[in-house]
From Swiss-Prot:
This is Flagellar basal-body rod protein FlgC. InterPro entries: Flag_bb_rod_N, Flagellar_basal_body_rod_CS, Flg_bb/hook_C_dom, FlgC. Keywords: Bacterial flagellum. Pfam families: Flg_bb_rod, Flg_bbr_C. PANTHER family: FLAGELLAR BASAL-BODY ROD PROTEIN FLGC, FLAGELLAR PROTEIN. GO terms for cellular component: bacterial-type flagellum basal body, rod. The basal body constitutes a major portion of the flagellar organelle and consists of four rings (L,P,S, and M) mounted on a central rod. The rod consists of about 26 subunits of FlgG in the distal portion, and FlgB, FlgC and FlgF are thought to build up the proximal portion of the rod with about 6 subunits each. It comes from Buchnera aphidicola subsp. Acyrthosiphon pisum (strain APS) (Acyrthosiphon pisum symbiotic bacterium). The gene is flgC.
Amino acid sequence: MSLLNIFNIAGSAMIAQSQKLNVIASNLANMDSTIYKNGKFYPYIAKQVVFSLDTAKNSKIGGVKISAIIDDPSPMKLIYDPNNPMANNKGYILASNVNPITEMVNNIAAARSYQANIEVLKTAKSMIMKTLTISE
C-alpha cells in the first residue's frame, strides 16, 4: 500500500459522507411533504444511504462508496387529525416516517466522520512533508 493511497481512501470517505449529509438534509426538508400520485396523497418516504467497499484493482483494500440510496423500511406514522382534508374516515392521516432525532444523530455522525477524514489527510500530508525533509 502506497502512502499516497490514503488520499484516495480518505477522499472517497469524505465524498460518501458528503452525499449522506445531502440525503439527511433532504429527509429533514421533506418530512412534512406529500406526493400526489394516482389520485391519492402519499407522505414522503425517508431515504437511507447504503455504503460498500470500493476496492482498487487487484487489491484487498480500498475506500468507500455509496452502493444505493434506498427507501427507509420503517412504517409511516398515523396521526389523528380529523380536520385534515386528507384524513381517512377514522380521522387519521398517514405521515412521513422521517424521525428528526435519528436524522440529527446521523447528521452529527456523518459530520464527525467527514472531519476525521480531514484530519487523516492532514496527518498524511504532514508525514509526506517530513519524509521529504529527511534527506536535508
